[in-house]
Amino acid sequence: MRPIFYKLRQLYRCNQNYKHHFKSNKGVFTVIKKQNTNNFIKPTVYKLNSINYGRCIEPFNENENIKINLKKITTWNVQELFWYCYKGNKINNIIDHIKQFDSDIICLQEVFESYSFELIVNNKYLKEKYPFYLTGTLANRFIIGENSGLLVLSKYPIKFHQFTQFHQTTFPDILACKGALYFSVGNTNFITTHLQSECPRIAKRQLQYIINESPFTNKTILLGDLNIDDACEELGLCNSNNMITHLWSSSKLDYILNLTNDVQLDIDIDHFSLENCSDHWPVHASFL
């Protein structure tokens, strides 16, 4: 019964978030339908006339001269799905680990529970350390489903480009608004995503699609839970990670990849105890 209670609470909080968003966001929210000859994936690309998306980040002057020197980035699937997140002190354990990261940008996946989302972005320590954040769509799929689960925390201003949602997926992802979030920090471009689970065939097609749809031509880093054990081979890239990132499958599912070969990265997996925390280990990358 407890997971069901948490799900009902999530739906209520999601409704409150939307009320807050449409009252407070000064940006004009538009949905642009993109035509695609590939019938397998029909994306919706969300764009704004400002950098705000969802109940999102602080506005900033893009012409303001802000010195940005990125040293380290992180991706982590935190498994905040309602079926798991009610157990023990899980979300606080996750926040405690995030506090210890020395990264400039942190990309999280599976931040599905709105209560968990609020605890992360409103945590006093994290708010001071990461004053900027960005999300994928906060809309729940089929009302009772899940949102995108994507959350980006940043020490520096974020420029939002687009969120491309996958509409044709399979179970269990058909119940979530999964997609790819494209953004920039300084002169470095990022794509963060969480691809189809339990079906590598679909995940690989999604991977190729979001790369083909990328607005970026240089200094582009892909990071997230790709749910593919051979993602580097799939993209024709040098394998930068030979260590497992997923506890139960003992697979390499989480990646930080340089797509344009103009950024040098040193990859490291943070193998701490995942008890009452997540089923994935964080992946860190230091800029060389």
Residues of each region from the PLM?
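Acidic/histidine-rich helix-loop elements
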Residues: 70-92, 141-143, 170-175, 196-199
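Flexible, surface-exposed loop/gating regions in the mature catalytic domains
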Residues: 78, 134-156, 160-194, 222, ...
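Metal-dependent phosphoester-hydrolase catalytic domains
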Residues: 2-62, 201, 214-221, 226-288
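Structured beta-strand-rich core segments of catalytic domains in phosphoester-bond hydrolases
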Residues: 27-65, 105-187, 269-273
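Short, flexible/disordered intra-domain loops and linkers
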Residues: 83-89, 118-120, 145, 233-235
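Soluble or luminal CAZymes and related metallo-dependent hydrolases
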Residues: 86-94, 116, 173-178, 201-209, ...
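Activation segment
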Residues: 82-85, 115, 162, 199, ...
